């Protein structure tokens, strides 16, 4: 096979791999951050991730957004990540097969469409109602879904 014929094959494989990685990163975040919040809660987390990908202040990939907080040498400081599950010291192993299947399906929907949710069109942050992070004062609350409060820039 000539080099010329191999180039299109390589070009076609890169996006498919990147898309699979993006779906896994998105599904993990939706699952670990909001599986107890049902479909709407998981979708809301996915919308926030996609909003960040589209925003110039954040990484331009889903995995980059989800993993933001990892140091360049690969270390992670506990509780210093943008998404708590990623640096809580626990392994990311789904234990609820039904919720994991739902998260994978919802991640595909969020990634393959321009799905948005009313009130979350520009949301880039959220937190659980059980905490009051200091960063929240710098943002405007825009919606509560389940046990999460979502925010937009002021």
Could you say what each language-model-derived stretch is?
Residues 1-10:
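Sec-dependent signal peptide recognition
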Residues 7-8, 18-20:
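Cleavable N-terminal signal peptides
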Residues 21-154:
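Bacterial extracytoplasmic/cell-wall-associated proteins, especially those involved in peptidoglycan
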